[in-house]
Amino acid sequence: MLQLNEIRKTFNAGTVNAKVALDGVSLTLNDGDFVTVIGGNGAGKSTMLNIVAGTYPVDSGTIRLDEEDITALPEYKRARLIGRVFQDPMTGTAADMWIEENLAIAARRGKRHGLGWAITQKERVAYREMLKSLDLGLEERLSTKGGLLSGGQRQALTLLMATMNHPKLLLLDEHTAALDPKTAANVLALSDKFIEEGKLTALMVTHNMKDAIAHGNRLIMMNAGRIILDVSGEEKKALTVDALLETFAKASGTEFANDRALLA
């Protein structure tokens, strides 16, 4: 369970460039929740994920994960508990390392290891089985460097690396935005698969309203650092893009000015 309580964050506070990114955000995710997050540019979506991951400190408020207060926990320690996939496919994998080496690093995350770092044959067998689930033929390319993979292949590999240790929370920060529509659909399908099979709790930020409606069991909309809509269950299933646009306009007094929100 993830609990955010009255989270506030202002960048450049006390200056003429002050920007309120999160304005008293409170949010609870129950175990197994897959929540999609929608909102215009500057709404606070990615800032919220960065706050949860520990990239940014909060100005005030608390963050709890499985009843543990992690508000002051450094980002590198939270990485043992939280899996994350970024927008840029180049971010999540090491370009100069083999596929099996990337997987080995992910598998050892949060574990103590000495000088004996060699990958065992047993591990290679396990990695091949994991890679088969991607259906990209990567199980036969363990010694291929990450930099030789396509953007979609690298993002799929990153997704596997982020979920292979069954994190308490998975953060997906516009992880298909840099991909072509077909590849994005494949990565989203893999996301659904890993979240469902691993019974993971997940937060997925997206600009694409159709994707926000189609995936997850719950949807929240943000504007000006606040949550202005929170729907789940049958209410979410009945949502349409037009209804979301209307809700945004009523709550914010502005049009949702982002063409990517309407992409198929």
What is the meaning of each model-derived region?
Residues G61-D69, L229-V231:
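Conserved ABC transporter NBD signature motif
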